[in-house]
Every structure is written in C-alpha cells, then in structure tokens.
C-alpha cells in the first residue's frame, strides 16, 4: 500500500512540475514578439543589397538574440543581471541598426543581483516601440544600482509617454509587462512601478531586496 501511495505522489509531483514548466513557457512566449522577428529579417534582406558587412553583423546579432531567447524558455531559475543586460544589448543594437534615430545607454553600477530571464529586454523593447521610435532623437537609459538593502533597476525613456496603461493591447504589450511584474514578484519578491507622463517619457523601476531571490 505504501508503495502505491509513493508512486501516486511521484506522479502528482511530476504532473505539477510539467504544468509549471508549461505555464513558464507560455509566459516566456508572450515576451517574444513575432513582429520583431519579421522586421529584423526584412532589415537584413534590405542590408544585403547595400552593405553586406552590416548585414552579416546583424545576422550574427539576430542569431545570438534567438539563441538566448530559446535558452530562456528552459530557464526556471533567476539569472545574473549581467546575462540579462547582455541579452538586452544585443536586442537594442539590432533596433539601433534599424532605427538610427534611437540610442540605448547603460549605467550599470550594481550587478550583484539575479532576476528572471526576459525581464529588462521586454521593457526596453516596449520603450522603443511605444516610446522613442517616433522621436527625432529617442533615448532609452538602463541603470542598475544599490540603494540601501535594495537592488534598483531603472529603465527610462524620453518618449511619448501615456496617462494610463491600457487594460489590453492588440500586440500583447500590456500582457508582456504584467508577465514581467508577475515573475519578478514570484521569483525575486520584487516590485515594479511605472511612472509616465504624456509627451515627456516613461520610467520603470524594478526593486529587489538584497538576498531575497527565491529561485537561485
């Protein structure tokens, strides 16, 4: 009897792990925007006829971006901030090739914390797509520093801003932001706040208490 109970418990645990993995993959997939994939391929195609060296460089960046996204699908634990920054830089460089009017700046003074994969990159993507891309000179800044017993990560832009985050958007932007918030809370006991002003820009602040990462 005890053996059958043990077998049943093993089955339940395995089933729960499978459901958790499926849920995690579903969340991650919402962070990978198909429009970016198609637009990047179109940009590479256009570059091939004009600048083969730039086209080759962009292909390399795009390959690295896809590889890291696929790795993120299997990432059940938090990752070092430096790894997420690296992924964000690859994404941002591709976008800066496509849109010469934007630039992404970094001020990383604290890399001692760990965060969920695909946390900063989707926020930078949102800042570019819905904030600075239409600006004559669009700027996104990513900063990380320590303040007391908290790790702070700040993503801010000089974009169009907004008065209220929409309940739902056609491209899944709001869903993606809420997924970042949810994973930050569950995996790091962290918080995310958004401050935005129309025609001035948006500021997103991630706060993680030092040593409070759950899955490490």
Regions found by a protein language model. Name each.
Residues 1-32, 36-175, 179-193:
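Two-component histidine phosphotransfer core
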Residues 139, 161, 198-205:
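Glycine-rich nucleotide-binding loop
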Residues 146-148, 198-200, 210:
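A short coil/beta-turn micro-motif at the C-terminal edge
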Residues 206-212:
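C-terminal beta-strand of the catalytic ATP-binding
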Residues 214-216:
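Short, charged, solvent-exposed linker or helix-capping segments at domain edges/interfaces
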